[in-house]
Curated annotation (Swiss-Prot):
This is Uncharacterized protein MJ1288. PANTHER family: TWITCHING MOTILITY PROTEIN PILT (PTHR30486), TYPE IV PILUS RETRACTATION ATPASE PILT (PTHR30486:SF6). InterPro entries: P-loop_NTPase, T4SS_GSP_E_ATPase. It comes from Methanocaldococcus jannaschii (strain ATCC 43067 / DSM 2661 / JAL-1 / JCM 10045 / NBRC 100440). One of its GO terms (molecular function) is ATP hydrolysis activity. Belongs to the GSP E family.
């Protein structure tokens, strides 16, 4: 189980380790397939978005980064919703993203000083572009922008809930377990159900551990509850009810 009270957060800061052989780590076909109509995962994602918004009476729409936010009332479920619509990655783009993430992670070193998040984000974007050029990847502009967006989101952002973290109108973000929707408390619309879920125990545990580490604390069997402060002073409360020692080992 996880419950979070978060207002405004910034990512951890890193320097690049230049003694890494990028090409040795990164082995893949340089040509990324572009035929999205034949990509089942892409079409499934489109259908999922349609199902989320087809019954909505829309209150408000806005954009956060590359994410479109739709707030409205679902006339079938009889509940208010906060829908996050992000760029869709095809199967080939997902494979490319996962390999690129490994490369960038290999280039990241231990944090040495506090850096403004905006400067860090710009710094990472430039480094990622350099990696693209070094590997001579054949990518269109749309694919490049999407990959950069997701790399930033998962490397220094907050993964699945990154867009929620960046919405200044949200006061609380909470989740009560695997397969259950994340809920938010909005200053104007109050309690809203999102379309974001953590699909597996491993995914949720990994996320909890990451948040705890940003508070300078650890989640263990002996210490399954963390109540702490994130770097900007926001409060975090996390409770886990399963063995996470394997997840700690995985993250290390």
């Amino acid at each position: 189980m996880i419950f979070m009270v978060i207002k405004k957060i910034f990512g951890e800061n890193f320097n690049f380790n230049k003694n890494i052989d990028i090409k040795k780590i990164f082995k893949l076909d340089k040509n990324v397939k572009k035929d999205r109509e034949e990509n089942e995962s892409y079409l499934d994602a489109l259908k999922e978005i349609y199902e989320e918004i087809k019954n909505l009476e829309i209150y408000e729409k806005m954009t956060i980064g590359m994410a479109e936010i739709i707030i409205g009332y679902d006339n079938v479920e009889k509940t208010k919703k906060y829908i996050v619509i992000e760029p869709i990655l095809t199967k080939e783009e997902i494979k490319l993203f996962l390999k690129l993430r490994k490369v960038v992670q290999a280039l990241l070193d231990v944090p040495v000083e506090e850096i403004d998040k905006e400067k860090l984000e710009d710094y990472l974007k430039e480094k990622i572009k350099e990696i693209f050029d070094d590997l001579k990847l054949t990518l269109d502009d749309v694919t490049r922008h999407k990959l950069i967006y997701f790399l930033i989101k998962y490397l220094i952002g907050y993964g699945k809930i990154d867009a929620l973290m960046k919405d200044e109108n949200l006061e609380d973000i909470s989740c009560t377990g695997v397969g259950k929707p994340v809920y938010v408390f909005h200053r104007k619309y109050e309690h809203l159900k999102t379309n974001i879920k953590f699909e597996t125990d491993e995914e949720l545990d990994s996320f909890c551990i990451s948040l705890a580490q940003r508070c300078g604390k650890s989640l263990t069997l002996a210490n399954p509850i963390v109540d702490g402060s994130l770097p900007d002073g926001s409060r975090l409360n996390v409770t886990l009810g399963r063995d996470i020692s394997d997840m700690v080992q995985h993250l290390q």
